[in-house]
């Protein structure tokens, strides 16, 4: 990795060993922020290792120190905070923070964790090390897939239109909504990696995927809706690398990554002997699955030849008798993280929000400067540029950018005009970041 090494092996191990679970009321606190910074560093190192095909010590450290279950618990905890506490904060009339970035870091925490899990779950041993928490992760991914299926058409407003005349908290809510889409897409990838391990998953996990959630039918709905594709002005666009990109006519028959993840997950769930033995092919399931035949074109089979086996399975299914729903009496594990957190915090959402308002998110100028300094140290620009899949985007209009804000060095712009228009929103964070840099 040479000059681009972010963490030395000893440093990475210290960060991994220190990972722990936090209570919901602790989110955004000093200790929580330090762990968030650690996760971001581990995230960048894991991506950097994978990008330049180096040995991948981050997932090994997470496995060896038993931290995958901790990451799953933190993921679900921040998901619950966003659903239960964040809306209360947004409704508090006496909460008008001068800077929303500390809250943004909590909102962004879910994206940080799911991104790290997406990077490391590519390796089957990571899934195995999740132990019984893989049940909770399956439930989490199912919730995100439901959001994707329910998502309306992809006619998003431009960032400029979305944030026009918004208060800082309203803008933060809109950013959280945009972030939720990307989080859900990463959850789809994590779920696909879990299905790669279908032959070694517990019966409880298989039953959860196939009977409780009926994931094969849900995946068929995802293929039908294709929420990561849209048409704008007659042009096909796919959501890739964090933004909507126009697909050239010559590339439109090419399988995109997210469709590929769905097909591989379906292949794993329908053709694995272990999964087939647990899946009940009811008349509803048969009707849903046979919809796949229309998608299995020669062009698709050329790109994913293994799907020929799936095509054969569907041909056999079309002639097979359906089964009534099975009502076996089975003792099995159930996910516990969401229910436990909800039980522990029931009736306390308002109190948690007010506690965080007073003790976590109402920072002094000095505290904000210190945080800005830590953020600047965490997000190493040379590393971010090395792992970025493409050129930076303009912070105002999202066009390809070549100029960086000279004061804070954190935000890119395509032209001077966009920088001037964005200053009203960017200014305070920019000044704090610049002051933090000078304080080093």
Swiss-Prot record:
Binding site for Zn(2+) 2: 405, 408, 426, 430
Binding residues for Zn(2+) 1: 394, 397, 414, 418
SUPFAM superfamilies: HIT/MYND zinc finger-like (SSF144232)
GO MF: molecular adaptor activity; protein folding chaperone; zinc ion binding
Subcellular location: Cytoplasm; Cytoplasm, Cytoskeleton, Microtubule organizing center, Centrosome, Centriolar satellite; Apical cell membrane; Dynein axonemal particle
Knockout mutant characteristics: Mice neonates exhibit growth retardation dying within 1 month after birth. Show head deformation and situs invertus (heart apex, stomach, liver or spleen). Display lung lobular structures deterioration and collapsed alveolar spaces. Show mucosal congestion in paranasal cavities. Show loss of ciliary motility and axonemal outer and inner dynein arm (IDA and ODA, respectively) components without disruption of ciliogenesis.
One GO CC term on file: apical plasma membrane
Tissue note: Expressed in the testis. Expressed in the tracheal epithelium. Restricted to regions containing motile cilia.
Family stated for the protein in its record: Belongs to the ZMYND10 family.
Record text on subunit structure and interactions: Interacts (via C-terminus) with DNAAF11 (via CS domain); this interaction stabilizes DNAAF11 at the protein level. Interacts (via C-terminus) with DNAL1; this interaction stabilizes DNAL1 at the protein level. Interacts with DNAAF4, HSPA8, IQUB, RUVBL2 and DYNTL5.
Biological role: Plays a role in axonemal structure organization and motility. Involved in axonemal pre-assembly of inner and outer dynein arms (IDA and ODA, respectively) for proper axoneme building for cilia motility. May act by indirectly regulating transcription of dynein proteins.
Name of the molecule in the record: Zinc finger MYND domain-containing protein 10
Gene: Zmynd10
């Amino acid at each position: 990795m040479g000059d681009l090494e972010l963490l030395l092996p000893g440093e990475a191990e210290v960060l991994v060993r220190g990972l722990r679970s936090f209570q919901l009321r602790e989110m955004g606190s000093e200790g929580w922020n330090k762990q968030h910074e650690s996760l971001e560093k581990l995230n960048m190192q894991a991506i950097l290792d994978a990008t330049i095909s180096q040995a991948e010590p981050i997932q090994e450290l997470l496995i060896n120190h038993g931290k995958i279950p901790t990451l799953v618990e933190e993921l679900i905890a921040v998901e619950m905070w966003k659903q239960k506490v964040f809306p209360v904060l947004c409704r508090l009339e006496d909460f008008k923070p001068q800077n929303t970035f500390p809250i943004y870091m909590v909102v962004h925490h879910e994206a940080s964790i799911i991104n790290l899990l997406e990077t490391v779950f590519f390796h089957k041993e990571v899934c195995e090390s999740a132990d019984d928490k893989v049940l909770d992760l399956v439930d989490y991914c199912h919730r995100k897939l439901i959001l994707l299926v329910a998502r309306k058409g992809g006619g998003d407003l431009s960032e400029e239109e979305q944030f026009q005349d918004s208060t800082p908290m309203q803008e933060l809510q809109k950013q959280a909504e945009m972030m939720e889409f990307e989080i859900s897409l990463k959850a789809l990838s994590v779920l696909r990696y879990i299905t790669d391990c279908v032959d070694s998953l517990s019966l409880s996990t298989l039953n959860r995927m196939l009977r409780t959630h009926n994931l094969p039918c849900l995946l068929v709905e995802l293929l039908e809706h294709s929420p990561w594709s849209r048409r704008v002005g007659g042009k096909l666009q796919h959501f890739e690398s964090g933004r909507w990109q126009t697909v050239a006519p010559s590339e439109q028959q090419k399988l995109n990554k997210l469709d590929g993840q769905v097909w591989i997950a379906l292949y794993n769930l329908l053709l694995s002997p272990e999964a087939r033995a647990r899946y009940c092919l009811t008349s509803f399931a048969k009707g849903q699955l046979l919809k796949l035949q229309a998608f299995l074109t020669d062009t698709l089979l050329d790109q994913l030849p293994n799907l020929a086996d799936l095509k054969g399975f569907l041909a056999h299914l079309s002639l097979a008798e359906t089964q009534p729903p099975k009502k076996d009496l089975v003792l099995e594990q159930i996910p516990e993280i969401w229910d436990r957190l909800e039980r522990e915090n029931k009736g306390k959402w308002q109190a948690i929000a007010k506690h965080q308002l007073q003790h976590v998110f109402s920072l002094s100028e000095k505290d904000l400067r210190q945080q800005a300094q830590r953020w600047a140290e965490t997000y190493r620009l040379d590393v971010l540029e090395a792992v970025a899949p493409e050129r930076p985007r303009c912070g105002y209009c999202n066009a390809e950018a070549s100029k960086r804000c000279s004061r804070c060095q954190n935000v890119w712009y395509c032209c001077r005009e966009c920088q001037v228009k964005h200053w009203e929103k960017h200014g305070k964070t920019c000044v704090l970041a610049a002051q933090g840099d000078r304080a080093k």
